[in-house]
Amino acid sequence: MPPDIHDVFGSALAALDTQQLRRHRRVVSALDGAMVQADTQPRLAFAGNDYLGLSQHPALIEAARQGAARYGVGATASPLICGHSPAHEALEQELARFVGLPRALYFYAGYAANAGAIPALVERGDALISDALNHACLIDGARLSRADLTVYPHNDLAALERALVAARGARRRLVVADAVFSMDGDLAPLPEMLALCERHDAWLYVDDAHGFGVLGEGGRGSLSHWRVPTDAMSSRLIYMATLGKAAGVAGAFIAGAPAVIEWLVQKARTFFFATGAPPMIAEALRASLQVIESEGWRRERLLQLRTRLACGLAALPWPAPASQSAIQPLLLGDNGTALRVMAALDAQGIWVPAIRPPTVPDGTARLRISMSAAHTPDDVDRLCAALLAASARPPV
């Protein structure tokens, strides 16, 4: 007799509880860019990825409203059937121009972009070389590809080169890395990585989910931040970025050489086997690109707030690695401490999520502090004061 489904998953959930690893959803409504209502209570949030505070921007809301009035609220089909509207076409052209690459392809989600593109680019018999701290969607894309996978230590260029040399017999070699690592906030050394790919005849696939809109001239992302030459970008590099973080809306795009993008149109299963995103989303994103470029004060405020936060965290007993992005980790070690400090902040009306394994390695549970241009200096000071009070409180 097969095991009872309730017993199987009830026991598995109980094991998660024992390890302090069960996650819980909260019912959240945005009040403004920095404040949310979570489980009916207002809280100052350092939890999301709305880095520029654009999710509530009037221009984006109005663009979405007009898009819905013109196109309706659904795409109705795959982009290869009848789900590719004039709004989607215009967005892709504007995204390509924005990042300085020849062509772009819009996906309904960042996870879908990576899970579909990577298996379209490499397959069994190819080599895929991945940073140890890459996001789960890059890891899953690598697994789905069935390429021979090598994982190199985080940002270790010497190890990356050894992996490239070891894979020289492969038909294709693809190096995959986040541009900004989502749980640490540090940057991948893209110029050096691209140089290694040039030297060893490999391609570089970059996920700029947390750099797009925040880094670079006019918010153009990590390629602009590192001043990667345009010719190198189009010949070796495949660029991906999400549009639900700094851009404030939803979806993702991949940009690169025209032949690469056309290949993804034909072979990325998450692109053509899914209904397209609503055209109203594309219109909101077109408005977002204009705001990202024109309202540079948002990036300037982020930089100022990051400096202020670093000064406040220096007074705490826990490590806070230097960050060049809108993400600031506070390393607490064990799951119990991370949950205790999160609860102490929550009691003060501040929401900062505790991040635990398997999202981060064992023994590195942390608070992931996400900054937004919607925050104020007083918000940062309030967070630092609450953390200092929590650090002085003995464990229960």
From Swiss-Prot:
* One GO molecular-function entry: 8-amino-7-oxononanoate synthase activity
GO process terms (BP)? biotin biosynthetic process
List keywords of the entry alphabetically.
Biotin biosynthesis, Pyridoxal phosphate, Transferase
Please list the cofactors this protein needs: pyridoxal 5'-phosphate
Quote the record's binding site residues for pyridoxal 5'-phosphate.
Answer: 110-111, 182, 210, 242
**Positions bound to substrate:** 23, 135, 359
Q: Which residues carry this modification: N6-(pyridoxal phosphate)lysine?
A: 245
Q: How does it assemble?
A: Homodimer.
According to its UniProt entry, the function of this protein is described as: Catalyzes the decarboxylative condensation of pimeloyl-[acyl-carrier protein] and L-alanine to produce 8-amino-7-oxononanoate (AON), [acyl-carrier protein], and carbon dioxide.
Q: Which family does it belong to?
A: Belongs to the class-II pyridoxal-phosphate-dependent aminotransferase family. BioF subfamily.
Q: What is this protein called?
A: 8-amino-7-oxononanoate synthase
User: Could you read off the lineage of the organism from its UniProt record?
Assistant: Bacteria, Pseudomonadati, Pseudomonadota, Betaproteobacteria, Burkholderiales
Gene behind this chain? bioF
